[in-house]
Structures are given as structure tokens and as C-alpha cells.
Amino acid sequence: MAATPKHTLLVVDDEPDVGDSVHDLLRREFRVLKAKSAAEGIQLMHDNEVHIIMTDQRMPQITGVEFLSKMRIRHPQAVRMLFTGYADLEAVIAAINQGHIYQFLKKPWQPEELIAAVREAAAEYERLVHQAEELSRLRDEIHQLRDRVTMLEQEVKRLRGA
């Protein structure tokens, strides 16, 4: 019996063959969701816990960079990947510099390249989750220490007044 995939990957591309090929290539390691539009991708993000988002740059209504920018705000821990068969170099550079994407892939890709990139994205997701958990733990610890300092200050005032 095969293990249940740990990470969910959303592929957004208006060309169904792309989503199908990514699904066929990665379905043993990842739960792969496919969307043919940004609107469908947003709905799948709303309905599922998605860890990795892959989107094409050139789509109707909205570019991949615009879509990933929106997803960064709504789902900051999801690792965002952009791919294109065209040389939209300025848009890609801007997206990378603004932190909207983790990785850029050029179509067509080699299967090994795609598998490695998605595995790296899954590892990055795990790092981000661990980092968020550690940050939360440290905030709780700081809060507890502040409470303890307040109690000690009150005790010092009480002892000085006695």
C-alpha cells in the first residue's frame, strides 16, 4: 500500500496538458490539484490546504505573477513557483525581487528538473512551517517572561513598602 502524500501541490495553467503531465509525473509523491484558471486556483486554495503553488506566467485575465502575489498575501506559507515558455524576464525578475516567487522554471522542463524543484519547494515549505512554529513558541516564551518580570516588580514594590 502506497503512503499518503504529505504535501499538496496546486498547478495553475490554462493549458490542461501541463497540469496533466505534472500530475502524472508527481502523483506518487504529492497530492496534485489542477486548475485551468486563476479563479479556479483561488477556489482550490480556499477548499484545500495547499503547500506548493505552481503557475504559468501567461494566462487569461491575470498573470502568474499577479496570481502568486495574491496568494502570498492570503497563504504566506505556501511556496510559490512560476513557469513560462516565454521570456517574460522583467516580470520574473520583479516577482523574485518582491518575494512573490520561490523558484522560476522555464517550459519545457526536464522531468528530473521538475521533480527536484518540487521536492526543494516541499523542503522549503517544511522550513517555513518550522520557522513559524519556533517564532510562535518564542513569542509565548517572551510573553511568559514579561508576566514573570511584572510579578517580580510588584513583589519588589511590596517588599520596599513593607
Give a label for each model feature:
Residues 126-162:
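C-terminal output/effector regions of signal-responsive regulators
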Residues 4, 16-34:
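Two-component/phosphorelay signaling modules centered on CheY-like receiver
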